[in-house]
Regions:
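Short, well-ordered beta-strand elements within core beta-sheets of diverse protein domains
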Residues: 133, 205-213, 338-346
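A helix-coil-helix interface module used to build multimeric assemblies
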Residues: 1-163, 167-169, 173-182, 191, ...
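Glycine-rich cofactor/substrate-binding loops
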Residues: 1-3, 42-46, 248-380
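Active-site-proximal structural scaffolding
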Residues: 50, 135, 176, 200, ...
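Proline-centered turn/helix-capping motifs that create local helix->coil transitions or kinks
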Residues: 61-65, 150-157, 230-234, 270-274, ...
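A short, charged helix-loop
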Residues: 182-198
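Amphipathic alpha-helices that form helix-helix packing interfaces
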Residues: 3, 7-10, 94, 98-101, ...
């Protein structure tokens, strides 16, 4: 209704319809003039999602204003613009959520800039890092995701459409382009793309693919925190409260819920995006298949994902003592590279690497520390 009213005002300013008609349409652009029961009854007769609504709305318009409602537009003009406004609202929520997540990650990173832990590659202890270093990668990725959403938002803001069934402005005539611009401004959107996109869905596909990419960022965080909360590691904890139940049969369980949900979202959203991507393939100027419902679904799922991430980061506990303890599990072997490069300046890199490798393997075999193995160089054939 707001779109039809914006269209009427834009047309009135161009002299396409009378000013009084635009005022009447705007005045009656309220849901109470389109009761659902009447719309449902009308739809049983006309079998058209928009015409049924327009017919009911027209009953409330006076002095012949109904003749100018939906003047020169087509159904997809209205519903595609509705979709644009919905996605714009969704983007606003998502960007706000990512900014909140950015602030939470920034605090988490600052608080743990000196929280030492084992850096792991391919599931093995590799080199020492800090937990703040780990979360700084989440922070940087989240910032890039904010910029990605803002870039998509600019394109969505230009995607209002009033070009008619085949993109020629035939219903509006020579004033079509200017009327479309004025309607877009009335709706708080940007300068519309000149090219018709009823059958060109790349902007919506980019929106969906951006959400898919963002879901993988959160999936990575969820997977990491699931692993770090393992009984054998225990370096982080999603603190759901003392009374929280992890299992109906195992009282000791503290299952990570938020992390698992993030991983699940990272699987669902990319599958949804594939449907929207497929919708780019259209026959002629416009085809029948539409992914509008999937666009709504993916937007709702994305908002559930960011809400989950916010709750998780607010509830996250970092077990610094456990991280320090786990750092020493290898009895100092995690520092073998540092020792290698210290010796490299004395005996050469290749010789040092060969020597420390043999020492490290000896330490593992005999279950002694790296420092003890180095002290006992007589055990190693150099």
């Amino acid at each position: 209704m707001n779109i039809e009213a914006a269209l009427a005002r834009a047309q009135a300013s161009q002299g396409i319809i009378p000013e009084w008609a635009a005022e009447e349409i705007t005045k009656k652009a309220e849901v109470r003039y389109m009761p659902k029961t009447e719309v449902d009854a009308e739809n049983e007769f006309v079998r058209h999602r928009l015409v049924s609504r327009l017919n009911v709305w027209k009953r409330s318009l006076e002095n012949g204003a109904e003749e100018y409602l939906h003047y020169g537009a087509t159904t997809v003009d209205i519903f595609d613009t509705v979709l644009v406004l919905q996605i714009k609202a969704s983007l606003g929520i998502l960007i706000d959520d990512l900014i909140e997540i950015e602030n939470l990650l920034l605090k988490l990173t600052k608080d743990n800039i000196e929280t030492y832990m084992a850096g792991r590659t391919i599931g093995q202890h590799a080199l020492p890092i800090t937990f703040g270093k780990k979360t700084s990668t989440w922070l940087a990725e989240n910032r890039r995701n904010i910029e990605r959403l803002k870039a998509v938002e600019e394109k969505i803001n230009r995607s209002v459409i009033l070009k008619g069934a085949v993109g020629t402005y035939l219903g509006l005539g020579s004033k079509g382009i200017e009327t479309e611009l004025l309607m877009s401004q009335e709706l708080g959107l940007g300068t519309p793309y000149i090219a018709d996109w009823h059958g060109v869905r790349d902007v919506f596909a980019e929106y969906a693919l951006t959400l898919a990419l963002i879901s993988k960022s959160f999936g990575r965080i969820g997977d990491e925190l699931t692993l770090l909360q393992m009984t054998e590691i225990g370096e982080t904890l999603e603190n759901l409260g003392f009374k929280a139940i992890g299992s109906s049969t195992m009282p000791h369980k503290k299952n990570p819920r938020g992390p698992g949900n993030l991983v699940n979202f990272s699987r669902i959203i990319p599958r949804q995006s594939e449907i929207i991507l497929d919708d780019m393939v259209n026959s002629f100027e416009r085809d029948q298949p539409r992914s509008d419902e999937t666009l709504k679904d993916i937007s709702i799922t994305a908002e559930l994902m960011t809400d989950t991430a916010i709750r998780l980061l607010n509830e996250l506990e970092v077990n610094k003592d456990v991280m320090r303890k786990n750092l020493n599990i290898t009895n100092g072997l995690i520092l073998s590279q540092r020792v290698t490069y210290f010796l490299a300046d004395i005996i050469g890199k290749d010789t040092a690497e060969s020597m420390i490798h043999d020492i490290a393997m000896k330490a593992i075999t005999e279950n002694i520390s790296l420092s003890d193995a180095i002290k006992n160089l007589s055990l190693i054939h150099i």
